[in-house]
A protein has these predicted regions:
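Acidic/polar, glycine-rich intrinsically disordered N-terminal extensions of enzymes
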Residues: 1-96, 205-208, 556-559
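Mobile "lid/hinge" segments at catalytic clefts and subdomain interfaces of large enzymes
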Residues: 2-29, 36, 203-311, 479-540
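Small-residue-enriched alpha-helical segments and adjacent helix-cap loops
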Residues: 2-7, 74-77, 99-244, 274, ...
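Short glycine-/aliphatic-rich beta-strand segments at the starts of folded cytosolic domains
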Residues: 50-110, 173-181, 214, 257-262, ...
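Short amphipathic beta-strand starts and helix->beta connectors
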Residues: 82-90, 117, 121-128, 281-284, ...
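Flexible, glycine/charged-enriched surface loops at secondary-structure junctions
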Residues: 129-133, 166, 204-211, 283-301, ...
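Terminal amphipathic helices with adjacent charged low-complexity linkers/tails
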Residues: 143, 147-160, 284-348, 383-384, ...
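Long hydrophobic segments that form regular secondary structure
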Residues: 332-335, 340-349, 354-381, 527-561
Length: 561
């Protein structure tokens, strides 16, 4: 007779293979792995040029259309007129429009005036005037027809730009500091490492089939969101070896947020590409390929921890130990470079805030004209949907500010315009549930009118991030006020667009995922009322020097509703 204490244990289930190549698990375990195994994604470029652009949209195969074309920076955009409530119920082909979103990768965010003019012209000629500055230094177009892609590529490549691997399971655009090479506090300009990686590894077939996307940040200043990238190199001075970079691995947001872990290693500038490449190969070989929602590097790093990750990196991929090193400094607040700031050469950099990154081809052409009038040939895009013009002489600053404002670029913005971000949203994204870009524009206008009397009482802007779905392209978990789009039931019992609220998130010194308000959602039409209510309560209840995030994390939930 078996007693309770002798009850047999349940049979332990055999762990399913995760598709880790390092373990010899090469059989594709999901549809994405199948199409990548059937034909290398980079091969789609030839079909676009030789077949699809000539024969039209209907000639595109399904696995190219919804799979491999991502490696060329292209997604089909959302068919117009389909409401967010149908996002999860319709088949992919029912959501597909016959036009594409196209993402131009701009590694380091660095552009010349000539390149900007080309980007503006493409928007006007092929994208119905659309152009969005993303939070990864890129430019995104919409309404791109397949027939126009060869000419767009020709124009981009003529000025050193491209769309290669701007999307897909590959090495995405590398974030860099928008003030690299010009900021007075910068000790090392990381641009050579970014340029080397782009020139030598992007488009390498050996690195073009990763388990999921791989995002990088390489910057001396901590102004390129290092905490939420797959790999980050952040500037730090080693007490014995001088300036170099602190290595951090395994960050990412999406539906489950992870902050990158320090490996405790210091990397000199000349070794950054080598360590970056070794990490990409580690991810390629050891990363999980069974479930798409667990295939990012962050899940492997979570399972391994920092020590094992470093040990495998050193032993299997570098063949040598890394030097131990100190942690990089962390900023107390977001560094967005908006406003007028002195460069190390005595000239000025001027940062501008379009609302949630939205602009147009005509506006970008106007920016190029304004730069030319100011004597500037260089600009940068930021990790916060902003634009920075470099090399502006003192006597050209005010004219530049005045010229840029009517173009939608404000160099002295309200705190609401300055700190509001939004993803693409329902207008064009097939994953979205609610609209975001226009909602952000309307919200900023509303807050500028309703809360202007509080602007001077805010030591730092309150970051408001709007996302059209749970995937957090607009980083809702690390915003002061993060708004995750969903369909909600309003007080009248109607299904309407709304948002789940996250409060008190942050990067830098305030590195924390925002608290989610349980059972509290806000209708899109009531966002202005909600933000006014919670900001007013913060102003009234805050302690001396207390930020919005600090207050939101300690406040009673009723105060936050």
């Amino acid at each position: 007779m078996t007693t309770t204490s002798e009850r047999p244990r349940a049979t332990q289930r055999t762990a399913k293979p995760e598709g880790q190549w390092a373990k010899g698990e090469f059989d594709p375990l999901n549809p994405n792995e199948v199409f990548k195994a059937e034909d290398a994604p980079l091969n789609v470029r030839a079909r676009i040029l030789e077949q699809y652009a000539r024969e039209g949209f209907d000639s595109i195969s399904g696995t190219d259309l919804r799979g491999r074309m991502r490696w060329m920076g292209m997604y089909t955009q959302r068919k117009q007129g389909i409401d967010g409530g149908k996002t999860a119920t319709l088949a992919p082909e029912e959501l597909d429009d016959e036009y594409f979103m196209m993402r131009v990768r701009i590694d380091g965010g660095q552009l010349s005036r000539e390149q900007l003019r080309v980007l503006a012209g493409i928007s006007t000629d092929f994208a119905r005037g659309t152009a969005d500055i993303t939070d990864r230094n890129n430019i995104q177009y919409h309404w791109i027809a397949i027939e126009d892609v060869p000419e767009i590529w020709r124009r981009l490549e003529a000025v050193g730009l491209d769309t290669l691997e701007a999307c897909g399971d590959c090495t995405r655009t590398t974030l860099g500091s928008p003030v690299a090479g010009v900021h007075p506090d910068e000790v090392i300009d990381a641009t050579p490492a970014i340029d080397f990686i782009k020139a030598n590894y992007v488009g390498d077939p050996d690195l073009a089939n990763l388990p999921r996307k791989f995002k990088s940040s390489i910057a001396w200043l901590p102004d390129a969101a290092p905490e939420i990238n797959d790999i980050s190199f952040v500037g730090v001075v080693h007490p014995d070896h001088g300036p170099g970079f602190d290595l951090q691995i395994g960050g990412g947001l999406s539906t489950k947020a992870f902050f990158a872990l320090r490996l405790g290693a210091w990397v000199p500038l000349e070794e950054v590409p080598e360590v970056w490449l070794a990490t990409v190969k580690l991810f390629r070989d050891h990363g999980y390929r069974r479930l798409r929602n667990r295939a990012r590097l962050k899940y492997l790093v979570e399972d391994w921890g920092a020590d094992k990750t470093r040990e495998v990196l050193e032993r299997e991929y570098l063949g040598r130990p890394l030097l131990d090193g100190p942690a990089a400094p962390t900023p107390k607040h977001t560094i967005d470079h908006v406003g007028v700031h002195r460069q190390k050469d005595g000239r000025n950099l001027v940062g501008f805030a379009p609302i949630a990154g939205r602009t147009s081809g005509a506006a970008l052409a106007g920016v190029a004209d304004a730069m030319e009038a100011a004597g500037s040939d260089r600009l940068r895009l930021t990790a916060y949907q902003k634009l920075v013009v470099l090399d502006v002489p003192d006597d050209a600053v005010e004219p530049l500010l005045e010229t840029m404002r009517p173009l939608g670029f404000d160099g002295r913005p309200s705190p609401w315009r300055r700190a509001t971000m939004a993803c693409t949203g329902l207008e064009f994204c097939k994953l979205a549930i609610v609209e975001t870009k226009q909602r952000a524009h309307d919200l900023v206008a509303e807050l500028e009118e309703r809360l202007a009397h509080l602007d001077d009482q805010l030591e730092h802007p309150i970051a408001i991030h709007l996302n059209g779905c749970p995937n957090s392209c607009a980083r809702i978990q690390v915003a002061d006020i993060g708004l995750k789009g969903q369909i909600i039931t309003d007080t009248a019992g109607e299904q309407v667009p709304g948002y789940q609220v996250h409060l008190g998130g942050g990067l830098g010194e305030d590195l924390v995922v925002g608290r989610k308000l349980r059972a509290h959602k806000v209708a899109a039409s009531e966002l202005g009322d909600y933000v006014e209510r919670v900001v007013t309560r913060y102003i009234a209840a805050r302690e001396s020097g207390e930020s919005f995030g600090d207050w939101a994390r300690r406040a009673d939930e009723e105060e936050l509703r």
